[in-house]
Every structure is written in structure tokens, then in C-alpha cells.
């Protein structure tokens, strides 16, 4: 399946793996790229040299294209932005901030820049800054979210910009991919399903929690102070929401969650850690290789789109 995104990025399938903090490291990124999609290394709050090491390790596992997600609010964002150029990375996705200050440097180095957006206004602004494409991410996704659903956001962004649009949020099988294409997207970004891939280094408890999740198992914390995060319900989210309803300050609530994502991902504490996952978790029932996942999803999507 060829689109402007597959041509631009040099990939076989229009599937991009989300740049998830503590999850999107070199093993996963390389596996997705080897399977024909675009793997991403999640920069998160990591120092530049850590990201550099991840890039080099990924290159030992694949010679296919992969990218880096740069979290712009990270205290290390300046260093990571430079490392991307120094290491010859050709695709960057961005989130949590404005990439404008890095655009000239990245464009001069031939880097394709793809910001994640949660509104039409932001998509237009990113196109004005010179973005090559945008990821329109709905609130069904795991982690930090906006207010619009994927179903409503994607077609509005498609109508508003001339650059390619990648749909994200609530996509975990071929039906979701086909639906995104019918809305005008030219690729999809998938996170939660890849978390449970065999190549993912996430703790087995985390994977099992996603696989056993039901349709109503996700919740959103942080709405009160304008920092909504979608994750799976557990003791930590219940305590957070209770304190939120009691009117606790952002600082008090932030303290409660410090280190909890790492606790869940690396230590397997899915009761007191933050188990970030999208609403699609209820649809995920097994652990597979990235190659199996992508083959299954694309086969289903192509069959459905062939009926149209």
C-alpha cells in the first residue's frame, strides 16, 4: 500500500510505532522497521547521549528507516535535537511543545519533521512552520491526550492542511487502519498494541494487564489542572482521582505520579504504577511479534479497503 507517507519515509507499510516513554527503545523500534513499518525511539526525558546510544543500538539490528520522537518539554530537548542530526536520523516526530526553534536545523539536515497535534489550529501552525506531515491524535490514545476523538479530529485536519495526515488514537487492528484511511489519513500511528509485542521490553505484568483489559478499563487523570493522561485503572489512579476531587494542587498530584510509569514498565508494579494504554486495550488479546501484528493488520485493512 503506497501513500505519500510510505514514499516520504521509505517504508513498506503506512504504520508508525508510537514514541512511548520507557517503552519505545531500540529493540521495539528496530523490530517495527524490520517488519516494514516505521519504528520510533522515544526520547522522553532522556539525555542526548542516551538517545544517541539507543540510535546506534537500533542500527545494529536494522538497516531500515527508523526515527526518534523528541519530547519538546524535556530539559534535554536541545541536546536530543542535535543528536538526531549528528546521527543522521531522517525522521523526527515531536510532542509536548513547539518544534519551531529546531526546524531550520532539521530541515537543513534533510530531516522529515512530523509533529503530533490534537487540534486543527495546531495542525495549521505546524504546516506553516514547515512540517512534512502531522499526526492527528485523538483522545482515545494512551498517555497525554487532547479533547477531540480520532473520528472527529482526523477528517477536520485532513481538510485543513495540504501535508499528509497520520491518524492516531484507538487504532489497533486492520479495521481501525481502514477507517483511518476512509477519513483521509495516509498512515496510522499505533502505540498500545506494540507495547505487548514479543520484542517489547515492557515487564510481562504490564503486557498482561493490557491483554486482560476490558473496554471500560481505561480512565483519565489530570483533567482538573489541564494535564489529562489516559491509563488503565488501578490503585494509583483511584488515589489520584480521589485527591483530584478533593481539590489538591497540581504539585501535590504530580508528586504522587513521579516515577510511576517506570515503576510499571520496568518493575511490573501495575497496581501502584502508571499503566499508560489507549482505549483500544480491550481489543488486544495476545502477544505477537511485530511482524505478525503488522501482517495481520495490513491484511485485514487491505481486504476491507478493497471492498470500497
Locations of regions flagged by a protein language model:
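Active-site entrance/lid segments in N-terminal catalytic domains of soluble metabolic enzymes
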Residues: 1-164
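Residue-level detector of alpha-helix initiation sites
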Residues: 23, 171-172
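Conserved active-site-proximal phosphate/metal-binding subdomains
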Residues: 152-166, 172-308
Amino acid at each position: 500500500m503506497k501513500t505519500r507517507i510510505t514514499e516520504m519515509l521509505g517504508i513498506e507499510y503506512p504504520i508508525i510505532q508510537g514514541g512511548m516513554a520507557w517503552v519505545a527503545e531500540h529493540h521495539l523500534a528496530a523490530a517495527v522497521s524490520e517488519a516494514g513499518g516505521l519504528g520510533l525511539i522515544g526520547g522522553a526525558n532522556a539525555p542526548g547521549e542516551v538517545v544517541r546510544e539507543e540510535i546506534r543500538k537500533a542500527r545494529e539490528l536494522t538497516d531500515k528507516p527508523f526515527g526518534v520522537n523528541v519530547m519538546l518539554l524535556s530539559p534535554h530537548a536541545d541536546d536530543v535535537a542535535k543528536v538526531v542530526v549528528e546521527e543522521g536520523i531522517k525522521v523526527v516526530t515531536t510532542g509536548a511543545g513547539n518544534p519551531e526553534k529546531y526546524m531550520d536545523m532539521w530541515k537543513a539536515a534533510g530531516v522529515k519533521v512530523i509533529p503530533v497535534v490534537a487540534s486543527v489550529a495546531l495542525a495549521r501552525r505546524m504546516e506553516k512552520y514547515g512540517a512534512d506531515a502531522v499526526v492527528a491524535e485523538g483522545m482515545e490514545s494512551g498517555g497525554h491526550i487532547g479533547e477531540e476523538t480520532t473520528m472527529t479530529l482526523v477528517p477536520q485536519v485532513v481538510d485543513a492542511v495540504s501535508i499528509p495526515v497520520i491518524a492516531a488514537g484507538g487504532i489497533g487492528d486492520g479495521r481501525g487502519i481502514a477507517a483511518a484511511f476512509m477519513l483521509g489519513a495516509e498512515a496510522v500511528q499505533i502505540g498500545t498494541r506494540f507495547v505487548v509485542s514479543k520484542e517489547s521490553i515492557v515487564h510481562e505484568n504490564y503486557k498482561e494487564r493490557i491483554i486482560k483489559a476490558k473496554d471500560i478499563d481505561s480512565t483519565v487523570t489530570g483533567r482538573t489542572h489541564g494535564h489529562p493522561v489516559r491509563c488503565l485503572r488501578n490503585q494509583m489512579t483511584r488515589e489520584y482521582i480521589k485527591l483530584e476531587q478533593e481539590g489538591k494542587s497540581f504539585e501535590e498530584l504530580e508528586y504522587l505520579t513521579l516515577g510511576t510509569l517506570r515503576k510499571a514498565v520496568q518493575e511490573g508494579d501495575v497496581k501502584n504504577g502508571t499503566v499508560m494504554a489507549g482505549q483500544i486495550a480491550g481489543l488486544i488479546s495476545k502477544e505477537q511479534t511485530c511482524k505478525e501484528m503488522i501482517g495481520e493488520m495490513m491484511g485485514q485493512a487491505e481486504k476491507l479497503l478493497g471492498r470500497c
